[in-house]
Amino acid sequence: MTNIRKSHPLFKIINHSFIDLPAPSNISSWWNFGSLLGVCLMVQILTGLFLAMHYTSDTMTAFSSVTHICRDVNYGWLIRYLHANGASMFFICLFLHVGRGLYYGSYTFLETWNIGIILLFAVMATAFMGYVLPWGQMSFWGATVITNLLSAIPYIGTTLVEWIWGGFSVDKATLTRFFAFHFILPFIIAALAIVHLLFLHETGSNNPTGLNSDADKIPFHPYYTIKDLLGVFMLLLFLMTLVLFFPDLLGDPDNYTPANPLNTPPHIKPEWYFLFAYAILRSIPNKLGGVVALILSILILAFLPFLHTSKQRSLTFRPITQILYWILVANLLILTWIGGQPVEHPFIIIGQLASISYFSIILILMPISGIVEDKMLKWN
């Protein structure tokens, strides 16, 4: 009799995705982040569900309801901080996952890569709306500043912003709709993640060499299930350390002050994972130009497959592009630091230089180095 996991219509899909899936024998720990993102998403949906049971999306009671969760609900503080810091873990895994794709040329899987970019935008939108929900000072002013950027769109801008707000300012209607979207988006993200996986399994995984690995495949289970499990335990250990010892490390103290439309905080800034994009936005003096640069800072990922000039897929054997890659990583860290600094000298010029070098490395220097390396190998 055929094994049920190979014959049952439902189990068969799971079997082909997580058990009998042929995987390259040499994929490193950089390939762990896909499964870790799945774990992060599950943690966020579960903790979010329990938070939603006690949260009220009304401007008068939102802040109090979060306080109530932390003080009166059994383990409410734990659920709240797991959710808040879980978002940070989500973004750490996301950035490492994208960075891995960039380094090893995984962007040549076009469909998988493009769904990934849509996922990145969806997660960023979800995180932004989630940050508004506690209705603290930074929640309110962050929502005001970021939604206001849409007013830079010619002709329809102002109307669009008022339509999103549901009035003439960020108010009750805005909070209610943000809660609704924040609740539904993670389920859309989960569906998109399945599509992401579906496209990946059409081609099979990439590997550190960037070469075809059809000749050397191993079953996903037990090899990579146990490897992923180790990653999951390490992730949870890191998350729990953050939650139990430093719960407010990555948060903003201003968000412990209830939202007040009459009092602007001295420094309006988003959560740490948006700071690099925020720095790029601020480095352009023109409003519309800043918005375009902000969107392009992420959307530039979609151009990567067309900017690939090398005959090699991965950066493993390409030392010049490797150097550029790590300069790009350092550059992003500088942008993250600048995004959290006030708009004054010398931070303005540092941010502008870092923004220029960010786009230059991706659009100009990396494609040139790909051609140069091919020339050095006499492959051209």
UniProtKB/Swiss-Prot annotation:
Location(s) in or outside the cell: Mitochondrion inner membrane
Which residues hold heme b b566?
Answer: 97, 196
What residues bind a ubiquinone, as annotated?
A: 201
List cofactor names only: heme b
Q: How is the cofactor bound?
A: Binds 2 heme b groups non-covalently.
What sections of the protein cross the membrane? 33-53, 77-98, 113-133, 178-198, 226-246, 288-308, 320-340, 347-367
Name a single GO biological process. Answer: response to xenobiotic stimulus
Binding annotation for heme b b562: 83, 182
Kindly state which keywords UniProt assigns to this record, in alphabetical order. Electron transport, Heme, Iron, Membrane, Metal-binding, Mitochondrion, Mitochondrion inner membrane, Respiratory chain, Transmembrane, Transmembrane helix, Transport, Ubiquinone
Which PANTHER family is this protein grouped with?
CYTOCHROME B
Extra info from the record? Heme 1 (or BL or b562) is low-potential and absorbs at about 562 nm, and heme 2 (or BH or b566) is high-potential and absorbs at about 566 nm.
Function of this protein?
Answer: Component of the ubiquinol-cytochrome c reductase complex (complex III or cytochrome b-c1 complex) that is part of the mitochondrial respiratory chain. The b-c1 complex mediates electron transfer from ubiquinol to cytochrome c. Contributes to the generation of a proton gradient across the mitochondrial membrane that is then used for ATP synthesis.
Recorded protein name is: Cytochrome b
Origin organism of this chain? Rattus norvegicus
Gene for this chain: Mt-cyb
